[in-house]
């Protein structure tokens, strides 16, 4: 691509799995930024994250280096999170929100508001019960 003068607009980390879960995520971001700067300096670097590992200092520092730090926060209700997002391992929504604040605005919050049912239970997080506390948090 580079030899043909074709360059990407954005280099995005996302997909099947959580990019920040990789044990060498910080080094991968550093290498990506170095290669981006060399071959396509106009391109942005983006990371789509479910926010699970932002409590790790190395992950936070790496995310602060990217152009688009996109972190997921569907709700502030832990019961809803466990029912719909079904995190495995450590996931404390209050801790996630506090760590999000440490980015001092250098983040994009991705949220999925939805209506419907799953396994016979409501997964509607569009009511004031869910939206107002979410607004307060963000």
What function would you assign to each model-found segment?
Residues 13-15, 111:
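Short glycine-centered, acidic/aromatic-flanked micro-motifs in structured strand/loop junctions
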Residues 1-12, 27:
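Conserved alpha-helical substructure of the radical SAM core
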Residues 21-138:
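Conserved AdoMet/S-adenosylmethionine-binding subsite of the radical SAM
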